[in-house]
């Protein structure tokens, strides 16, 4: 088990939703690799090329040492980023922390390309699910993420998360999420209809009471800079149209981003602290 922990970064990250990061940040564990192949991935340095792996084959005890060091600074939560392909390792880290006497809020930060059974097996271990619901159209999923079955698989996974957590999001005294579900959606340029269809799917298949995070932080990476659609940033009018649809459909809980957020999320995983 220990030989398989390929870690891209373990760091304090302050760029998640306010209820996830709080003011001090969350201890995020960024795993190398990914089970999706999104053309526009903002973390492509570690998810696709695999060229930036700060700690290949890292031992569990060393991971726990680093996480405990951050938790000891007063950070109350641990996030597992891109964990779908390493779920046994996620479980091992949580159980290892518990054995050391630490029970932080655990956040499963996923692209939602998870089997329903996998999510079911995380019940009782994960406090907050933070899934990204990317597409409902299989053709778009195929073109942009090479995953024709993404819409069906993601919906089943998110339904299981909803079954476990419902629409209620509970908070600690500092306003940080302690338990529940927050569904993310990144609005992509030129795909406004798709974004509205994603919101419609959530409303019809789950509830308009769930907490949503509608993200505007898309930035064209070097991978897609010449792409006819993905090669530009999101227009303000495009994002505002999706925000308006969110309100019209009756969603009442969630967060939206400022349009300059695409300047804030540009990690450099060759650095010890990618977000500084």
Language-model-derived ranges and their functions:
Residues 1-128, 137-138:
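Conserved Radical SAM active-site core
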Residues 166-276:
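Auxiliary Fe-S-binding modules of radical SAM enzymes
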Residues 142-174:
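Anionic-ligand binding region
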Residues 45-55, 143-148, 226-233:
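Short glycine-enriched, charge-decorated loop/helix-capping segments at active-site entrances
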Residues 47-48, 87, 112-115, 133-151, ...:
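Conserved radical SAM core fold
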Residues 123-138, 209-218:
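Non-cysteine beta-strand/loop elements that form the S-adenosyl-L-methionine
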Residues 27, 78, 106-108, 129-131, ...:
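Hydrophobic faces of well-ordered beta-strands that scaffold small-molecule active sites
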Residues 94-105, 156-164, 236-244:
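Alpha-helix-loop-beta-strand connector modules within alpha/beta enzyme cores
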């Amino acid at each position: 088990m220990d030989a398989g922990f390929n870690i891209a970064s373990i760091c304090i990250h302050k760029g998640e939703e306010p209820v996830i990061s709080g003011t001090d940040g969350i201890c995020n564990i960024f795993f190398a690799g990914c089970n999706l192949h999104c053309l526009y991935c903002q973390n492509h340095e570690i998810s696709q090329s695999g060229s930036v792996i700060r700690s290949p084959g890292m031992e569990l005890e060393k991971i726990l040492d680093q996480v405990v060091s951050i938790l000891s600074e007063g950070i109350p939560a641990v996030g597992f980023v891109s964990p779908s392909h390493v779920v046994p390792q996620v479980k091992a880290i949580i159980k290892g922390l518990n054995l050391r006497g630490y029970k932080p809020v655990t956040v499963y930060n996923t692209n939602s390309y998870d089997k329903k059974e996998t999510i079911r097996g995380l019940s009782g271990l994960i406090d907050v699910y933070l899934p990204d619901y990317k597409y409902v159209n299989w053709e778009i999923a195929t073109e942009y993420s090479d995953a024709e079955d993404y819409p069906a698989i993601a919906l089943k996974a998110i339904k299981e998360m909803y079954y476990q957590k419902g629409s209620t999001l509970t908070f600690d005294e500092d306003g940080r999420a302690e338990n529940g579900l927050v569904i993310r959606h990144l609005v992509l340029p030129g795909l406004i209809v798709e974004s509205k269809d994603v919101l419609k799917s959530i409303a019809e298949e789950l509830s308009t009471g769930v907490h949503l995070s509608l993200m505007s932080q898309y930035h064209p990476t070097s991978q897609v800079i010449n792409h006819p659609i993905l090669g530009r940033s999101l227009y303000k009018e495009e994002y505002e149209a999706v925000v308006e649809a969110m309100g019209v459909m009756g969603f009442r809980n969630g967060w939206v981003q400022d349009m300059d957020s695409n300047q804030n999320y540009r990690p450099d995983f060759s650095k010890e602290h990618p977000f500084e």
